[in-house]
Amino acid sequence: DPKEKLWLQDKMEPIKNQPSLTAEEKKHILYKLIQAENFEKFVDKKYIGHKRFSLEGSETIIPVLDMLLSLAAAEKVDEVVLGMAHRGRLNVLANIIGKNMQEIFSEFEDISDVDSVEGSGDVKYHLGSSGVYETMYGDDINVSVASNPSHLEFVNPVVEGIVRAKQQMMNDSLKNKYIPVLLHGDAAIAGEGIVAETLNLSQLKGYSTGGTIHIIINNQIGFTTSPVDARSTVYASDVAKMVQAPIFHVNGDDPEATILVTKLAYEYRMMFHKDVVIDVYSFRRLGHNESDEPAFTQPVLYKAIRNHPTVKNIYQEKLLSEKVTDTSE
């Protein structure tokens, strides 16, 4: 669509894709990265060997979701509904949904509340939750993450159905009050047919939710499989080309760049009510789960990863060099 292309050009070319953030916004990004990293470190030390499918190596996803919710709250969106698999789910529940940490840790210890509603007995990284998120600007927004099975990407049409139902029940004819956000793994988005099926429904009158924001946690590995052995396309996001969705490839070690494309993706969705993709290139610091030793199957890759600093440390050093913050903070 020429109008969409012109709109994107007008947004990107004048600023040469260079982010412009205030000192407070930069500090807030660092704060969210610290939250994300500290959660993983604490769980790693406290519950050694427990499966948690950590977000380590891809922590920038937390500031991305924070920015999405901040933008949505500022425009009085009623609710953002998230769909995601196991990777980073506990981190999102803790730092985005606001699920009580005590509840999360009790699930590691297999402590259940006998007085609560009958539970599913499902594993902790499949459970959904809802909460109210307070943004850095002081706004509140409802946010929920749908429960999901082990079947990757199966949650996609479920989230779309949840959002569509809310839009219809609340007479949200403009589809601006309820927004679906789907997080994918790079191997899963390319490998699961349900992704293409759901994309195919995105512009149909009977199924459309006014555009979905897709975020790929692209850690460049699927369990033990390299991208070259996992898909026939160059990019994991190529499936989204079937609906001509804009795709933004961004370096997960550059939080400011990811925030820039997050703003762009959100604005595009609200302007054109179509799907849009943020492809965050990152890595997986640990194995597929915490009992897996990835160096057995990917020795060269994991030698490089073990020598690579965390995104929090990279960004912290950047802000120190810019004198945006100091060591006392």
Give a label for each model feature:
Residues D1-V181, A187-I194, L199-T212, N218-V228, ...:
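Conserved internal helical-beta-strand scaffold that buttresses enzyme catalytic cores
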Residues D78, P246, D275:
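Residue-level detector of anion-binding/catalytic polar loops
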Residues M84, H184-G185, I216-N218, N251-G252, ...:
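Active-site proximal loops enriched in glycine and acidic residues that flank catalytic Cys/His/Asp
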Residues L204, V239, Y268:
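Hydrophobic/aromatic ligand-binding patch that stacks against planar heteroaromatic rings
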Residues A230-S237, Q298-A304:
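Acidic, Ser/Thr-rich peripheral helices and adjacent loops at domain boundaries
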Residues T233-H249:
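Conserved catalytic cysteine-centered active-site region
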Residues P255:
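ATP-dependent adenylate-handling ligase core
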Residues T258-E329:
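Active-site or pore-adjacent capping/gating segments
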